[in-house]
Amino acid sequence: FIAASVIVLTSSFLIFELVASDRAMSAYLRYIVQKADSSFLYDKYQNQSIAAHVMRALAAEQSEVSPEQRRAICEAFESANNTHGLNLTAHKYPGLRGTLQTASTDCDTIVEAAALLPAFDQAVEGNRHQDDYGSGLGMAEEKFHYYLDLNDRYVYFYEPVNVEYFAMNNWSFLQSGSIGIDRKDIEKVFTGRTVLSSIYQDQRTKQNVMSLLTPVYVAGQLKGIVLLDINKNNLRNIFYTHDRPLLWRFLNVTLTDTDSGRDIIINQSEDNLFQYVSYVHDLPGGIRVSLSIDILYFITSSWKSVLFW
């Protein structure tokens, strides 16, 4: 009788601990998603800030490009891997930080762009150095920014991109909807808004990513798009449980595109006995966040209770 009572008592205590842990961790998973959502909102704000800076530069009265600058641009203009532009294989044009790729073989077509794009460099640099203020929103890292000009058919990457590894040859990718956004949707639906793309395979990295797209307008007409790629490493930094590093070992985190079915597996538990806590949340744009914790986390974090049982 005494042995049975002890078993009942210790089992009741263990069940109580398990239920309490379930409630606490369910609330914590909701907190993780809320923090990630805040990080996405901040990324949207930064993208909009960059796009606004570019639009102001486009709207300002442009002085004519000097003969010296035009000569420097055309001397640095090069062709490689069936594409053309500036800083394709090495940093030959110091006026731009990154790489400009274009479908045109004529350097005169990108002279004005090369004179304008330092405004994009300044905007990205300024936004990257904004303080986090201890919010832990994953803002300290440097995500991949670029500007796509739909009218003049060029793309400018803030980070240098070696054309031997990636060349923008598919200039109709937006119209084909390969990133989940069609040009007609941009023109009709999200004037001035930042849109989250579907999850798609990035041509540059061959990995599943999603992008934030902010339109750039001139005189009310769509001219280009400022893009920010969010990849698996970015998402790991956003979702990482800094205050509970042990939990990360037993946490499953996946983003799934509800339309295409593509996913980004952000983290997987080291062991998978069975899930004892899970949480699913749908973000705007058809992106589903799925989180779950393996039972081994409870056993590891509550080992004294398990040992007592």
Give the ranges of each region predicted by the language model:
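Extracytoplasmic/periplasmic sensory segments of membrane signal-transduction proteins
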Residues: 30, 44-172
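Extracellular/periplasmic juxtamembrane segments that couple receptor/chemosensory ectodomains to their
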Residues: 215-218, 230-233, 243-309
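Hydrophobic segments of polytopic membrane proteins
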Residues: 183-186, 192-199, 234-241, 253, ...
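Extreme N-terminal signal-anchor transmembrane helix of membrane signaling/transducer proteins, especially
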Residues: 1-23, 307-309
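Juxtamembrane membrane-water interface segments immediately C-terminal to a transmembrane helix
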Residues: 15-45, 51-55
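Extracytoplasmic/periplasmic ligand-binding sensor regions of membrane-associated signaling proteins
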Residues: 128-132, 136-226
